[in-house]
């Protein structure tokens, strides 16, 4: 189904991998890419359950936009193990203006396809995705 604002479709695999992350916890993160020629969002990379936020940050290109889902496990201030599903809108300052516009205009529609996102994080460089940022946003 295409997005009226940006004309982007969402590949079925995007939702399937998200459901696997959410229900089976078979992935730590998913990186999504917009294929401009096919006008659709596709899965670019899957993170294994043992990987961390550092692996996610290292997997994002330095000069291209992406969307990512991150399953963040943490211990609450009460000492209770918790988990939050983050949506990361990665838009580095060095990305092309056209790319930033396409990702920005498609974001809300894409997020609606992924039922169960709990926290959104906008990041323009890896320092905006360090552990303290995830912890502070998760509570």
From Swiss-Prot:
Protein name per the record: Actin-depolymerizing factor 3
InterPro entries documented for this protein: ADF-H, ADF-H/Gelsolin-like_dom_sf, ADF/Cofilin
Protein function: Actin-depolymerizing protein. Severs actin filaments (F-actin) and binds to actin monomers.
PANTHER family listed in its UniProt record: COFILIN-RELATED (PTHR11913)
Example GO biological process: actin filament depolymerization
Record keywords, A-Z: Actin-binding, Cytoplasm, Cytoskeleton, Phosphoprotein
Phylogenetic lineage: Eukaryota, Viridiplantae, Streptophyta, Embryophyta, Tracheophyta
PTM annotation (Phosphoserine): residues: 6
Protein's organism: Arabidopsis thaliana (Mouse-ear cress)
